[in-house]
Regions:
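Short glycine- and hydrophobic/aromatic-rich loop-to-beta-strand nucleating segment
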Residues: 132-136, 175-177
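Conserved alpha/beta core of the MobA/IspD/sugar-nucleotide pyrophosphorylase nucleotidyltransferase superfamily
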Residues: 1, 142-194
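Nucleotide and nucleotide-moiety/phosphate-recognizing core
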Residues: 1-130, 138, 161-170
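Short, small-residue alpha-helix embedded
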Residues: 135-136, 140-143
Length: 194
């Protein structure tokens, strides 16, 4: 399982990983929910705000992997995670820490859905696209070298036949925190502390 927490939050101007919901940082919340699914291995990719984010996770289990190229975008963190999961041969759940409505039940539903999907993959529906959180195959993770910049696996998941990918419809996961407007909306909706 991969929790991506390396971003620099440049559009927000403050580390979104450390925003809180109910007094708990979003990164702690994401890792706690990920751990609740009892993964074989849990890695957290750190980059921007590395020490602050690691400190927020001090009481949780998981391997912290540092992405020295975090400024290059999401793909560089996926490359680090792929290297860190060498030897793991099962499905891989990939999630960020910027969806304040995320619950462990979302993650478990994705894992269960991927288990029954022909492709072995499951993804969250974001409008007409597929995205995070998502379950991908180990082979897809190993092929992350073809990703660049802020590319994730959404395009590859969308290119699979639609009936082979299990889809999670969870409107509450549409809200992810990228900028001040998202933060304001999340506070107004009760998803973040004010």
């Amino acid at each position: 399982m991969i929790v991506l927490a390396a971003g620099g939050s440049t559009r927000l101007g403050a580390p979104k990983q450390l925003l809180t919901r109910g007094g708990e940082t979003l990164v702690h919340r994401a890792v706690r929910h990920a751990a609740a699914t009892h993964p074989q291995r849990l890695v957290v990719v750190l980059g921007g705000y590395r020490s602050e984010v690691a400190c927020a996770l001090a009481d949780l289990n998981g391997d912290h992997l540092y992405n020295p190229r975090w400024r290059e975008g999401l793909a560089s963190s996926l490359h680090v995670a792929a290297q860190g999961l060498t030897g793991h041969d099962g499905p891989v759940l990939v999630l960020g820490c910027d969806q304040p409505a995320l619950e462990a039940t979302h993650l478990q539903r994705l894992l269960d859905g991927a288990n029954s999907a022909a492709s072995g993959c499951a993804a969250t529906v974001h409008g007409t696209a597929l995205g995070s959180p998502a379950v991908i195959t180990r082979a897809m993770l190993q092929d992350s070298g073809g990703l660049h910049g802020d590319q994730g696996f959404g395009g590859r998941l969308s290119s699979l036949s639609s009936d082979s990918v299990w889809r999670l419809d969870a409107a509450e996961l549409q809200l992810d925190i990228d900028d001040a407007a998202d933060q304001i909306a999340a506070i107004a909706g009760g998803w973040l502390d004010g």
